[in-house]
């Protein structure tokens, strides 16, 4: 059960999975996440821009009863320049604090639909703060796993 874990416990577990499965794990900090969001928003491509505020049909949510997360990176067609799961299958914890909250959540998750949980969403204490202009957000850490070559 991962529902009752600390951020650090989950961080150590993810790091261990990466080492034990011969994959490279890289962390993307808030500034890098925001740069990706900014690039998508300003790309001139309406599909990429829309992904930052409405990921309907792109996010890894079940689309049914909201009780079925799917494996990270399992739907390759949802990648944007090899970046997976930006609309999330589960929320990610940020390493930076947000206000008085030590860790905030970013991205939607399997119980969201695409417009209530897009890539740019931030959540703290169960409330959502939608950021339509993603470069205004400031804290996120995202773990990406890829096979070692």
PLM segments and residue spans:
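Disulfide-stabilized, aromatic/cysteine-rich ligand-recognition loop
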Residues: 4-18, 24, 28, 77, ...
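Short aromatic-cysteine micro-motif
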Residues: 1-85
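Surface-exposed, flexible loop/turn segments at secondary-structure boundaries
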Residues: 33, 98-99
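Active-site-proximal beta-strands of protease catalytic cores
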Residues: 87-97
